[in-house]
């Protein structure tokens, strides 16, 4: 391949709407082109990277006995009606009717298709366990596509589905898949990806992990304990806080004119937000019924946990007179009947605190939950905070980081096999529902994530295992016959030896050539110039500037192949 005929223009500057480094560099470098919101075409370099990542994934899935299959992108709505997700998933699932008026969907995941494929093919316990997987296009109508390939609407994903006859067997396979993911990310050049406990969301199941690339630009919040290694997505993390023991005070109603926020009322009463209770109001989407969450004044509601607790989608409440509550002065004592009330565990040991009195311009101080409200049920619905207590080791060591989710794994249980009536005949001659696991990796997002953590000011620095080419040959002052002869020979020799090589033989300045080479991010570079040939050598260097050497033009292939093997070995994990 020659740079002169490589489609895709390279730019000095990125468009103003690029929000992440990876997005800017991939646009500047001629990797991707936007077609519409969250929709991208791939030029050759990006496609080659994607194919290499897919091959790594394929090798690791085959290594744990995966069977590669292919599902359709378009599925009948009736299939999703079987599982219940046709109505339970919102507008991110793209629905349409075909010419015959039949409801159809564009697949955003393929659990339904996997069960439909397997339920008529795996009727006996002797066929279990098994795992099927595909690497294929998905469409999710994201409301906030952004960041280039970080969050798109159409994307390529590896999705795998395993089927088991026991929970123990699922857990054993889940561990294998977990290890396979570690190998995939290590081989792709991002061993810093970590697994975190996660919320299963619409996928269902009780056990799930997300694989996160820790980076400041990540959209996900990660809760980490550096003391014991506990890691969780904030959506699934428990918030455990310590409450000070305050002197017991009598319950007293106090006048707090126009003090409607926690900050206002605490300043007015000379109290800390840690000694206060705040109310956060929601309404259920289905009927607009009111939900009030009470938690310690310095904390925030974990809306994922709240949604899971109440099994309902919700939105921020719009308070109306008919609700019977006093906005800005709402508290747990004296609420009207018929309101769903959730008490966070942060209030369980809090005493002598400030709370709304459910009366215009009044608050209580000196409130005590047990004394003033009696026995109530507490739930964990607050977001974990930095400095909080680790749920595993019990130390005040929680830190908060950001991350990009590049993969996920779930123990689904029988959610889909039961709803879609997939059964097998067990050894005791009874019909049972298989237990499922599912395992996903976003290919495009992984490309962008690698670029996000492996670049400099000049362009991407692709790991050797996924780079679009392994070596770039640059011929400087190609009009020089000696330069042309040597550079052409090096290029042809490397090609014949099976090295993936791209050749820049354009008659351009060294500055432009090296700038384009940096944007292509090829990990190894050979420079042939009159200056190097004066010393009967060519320059051999790495894109990351970790090494640089002169090579004898007659011994290029052996040296280059040895270096490639060394770099690949450095990214290959031990079994």
Cite the ranges covered by each PLM segment.
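Generic long, charged, amphipathic alpha-helical segments
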Residues: 459-513
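Short, hydrophobic beta-strand segments
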Residues: 38-43, 156-165, 210-212, 406, ...
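C-terminal, non-catalytic macromolecule-binding modules
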Residues: 265, 437-466, 470, 565
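Extended, low-hydrophobicity, polar/charged segments
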Residues: 111-116, 144-158, 168-439, 443
């Amino acid at each position: 391949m020659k740079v002169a005929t490589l489609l895709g223009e390279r730019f000095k500057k990125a468009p103003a709407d690029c929000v992440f480094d990876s997005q800017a560099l991939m646009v500047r470098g001629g990797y991707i082109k936007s077609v519409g919101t969250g929709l991208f075409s791939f030029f050759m370099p990006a496609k080659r990277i994607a194919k290499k990542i897919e091959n790594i994934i394929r090798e690791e899935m085959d290594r744990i006995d995966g069977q590669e299959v292919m599902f359709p992108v378009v599925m009948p709505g009736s299939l999703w009606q079987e599982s219940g997700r046709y109505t339970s998933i919102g507008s991110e699932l793209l629905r349409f009717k075909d010419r015959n008026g039949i409801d159809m969907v564009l697949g955003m995941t393929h659990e339904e298709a996997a069960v439909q494929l397997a339920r008529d093919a795996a009727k006996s316990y002797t066929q279990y366990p098994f795992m099927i997987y595909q690497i294929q296009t998905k469409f999710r109508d994201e409301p906030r596509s952004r960041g280039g390939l970080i969050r798109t609407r159409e994307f390529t994903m590896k999705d795998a589905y395993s089927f088991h006859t026991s929970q123990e067997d699922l857990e054993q396979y889940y561990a294998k898949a977990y290890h396979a993911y570690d190998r995939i990310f290590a081989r792709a050049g991002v061993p810093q990806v970590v697994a975190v406990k996660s919320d299963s969301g619409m996928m269902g199941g009780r056990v799930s992990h997300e694989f996160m690339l820790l980076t400041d630009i990540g959209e996900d919040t990660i809760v980490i304990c550096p003391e014991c290694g506990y890691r969780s997505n904030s959506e699934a993390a428990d918030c455990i806080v310590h409450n000070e023991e305050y002197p017991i005070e009598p319950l007293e109603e106090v006048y707090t004119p126009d003090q409607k926020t926690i900050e206002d009322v605490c300043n007015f009463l000379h109290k800390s937000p840690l000694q206060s209770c705040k109310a956060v109001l929601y309404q259920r989407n289905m009927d607009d019924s009111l939900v009030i969450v009470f938690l310690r004044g310095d904390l925030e509601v974990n809306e994922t946990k709240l949604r899971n607790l109440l099994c309902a989608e919700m939105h921020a409440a719009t308070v109306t007179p008919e609700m019977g509550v006093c906005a800005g002065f709402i508290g747990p004592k004296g609420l009207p009947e018929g309101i769903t009330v959730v008490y966070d565990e942060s209030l369980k040991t809090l005493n002598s605190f400030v709370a709304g009195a459910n009366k215009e311009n009044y608050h209580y101080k000196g409130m005590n939950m047990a004394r003033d409200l009696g026995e109530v049920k507490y739930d964990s619905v607050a977001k974990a905070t930095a400095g909080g207590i680790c749920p595993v080791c019990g130390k005040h060591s929680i830190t908060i980081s950001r991350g990009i989710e590049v993969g996920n794994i779930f123990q689904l249980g029988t959610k889909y096999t039961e709803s879609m009536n997939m059964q097998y005949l067990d050894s005791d001659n009874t019909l049972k529902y298989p237990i499922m696991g599912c395992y996903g990796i976003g290919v495009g997002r992984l490309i962008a994530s690698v670029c996000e953590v492996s670049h400099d000011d000049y362009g991407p620095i692709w790991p050797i295992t996924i780079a679009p080419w392994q070596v770039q040959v640059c011929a400087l002052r190609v009009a020089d016959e000696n330069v042309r002869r040597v550079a052409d020979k090096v290029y042809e020799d490397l090609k014949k030896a099976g090295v993936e090589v791209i050749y820049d033989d354009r008659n351009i300045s060294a500055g432009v050539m090296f700038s384009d080479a940096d944007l292509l991010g090829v990990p190894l570079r050979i420079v042939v110039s009159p200056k190097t040939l004066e010393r009967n050598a060519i320059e051999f260097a790495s894109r990351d500037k970790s090494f640089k050497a002169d090579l004898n033009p007659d011994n290029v292939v052996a040296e280059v192949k040895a270096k490639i093997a060394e770099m690949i070995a450095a990214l290959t994990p031990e079994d």
